[in-house]
Amino acid sequence: MELLEQRILRDGRLLPGGILKVDSFLNHQMDPQLLQAMAREIKRLFADVRVDRVLTIEASGIAIAILAGLEFGCPVVFAKKSKTKNLADTLYTAEVPSFTHGNTNTVVVSKEYLHTGENVLLVDDFLATGAALVGLRALVEQAGGTVVGAGIAVEKVFQGGGDKLRAEGLRIESLARIASMDEKGIRFC
């Protein structure tokens, strides 16, 4: 998606350790018009499948997931990174290592919000190693649902997660695919 790529080149910043900082428009301060355009593109890319529910992970994927849910006309659920007191004891759980934060989270979704037979679209802001998508897919599988694909804002292709998951049969549509990034700049696929 050229609009997103241009915004990354203009406002994104590279940090040590392979981190792309896009918090001025995507995952801290957000540009609603850009997010809406991204959600519309995800809808276009997945127009051939029925989507009953959108699932993302707390917190940075929530904004784009909500807008995607509006486009598909379906509910949006986000996996929480910790169990809170107001969650029931009937939970689906999965372990998800975080590349950005360098830790592992046990993500949870109440069994009230994922159901057998549902077609679920995974949505997230970044795809690097693929750990978040693996965890989200596990939650859907525990519920007896079907993952129809994953809509991703930014894929770091050089980290291999997308290729691995595609080889396992997961349909992934990424709006911006980064082939490499270093002190010389960001190069898209």
For the regions a protein language model found, what residue spans apply to each?
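PRPP-associated nucleotide enzymes
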Residues: 1-123, 127-189
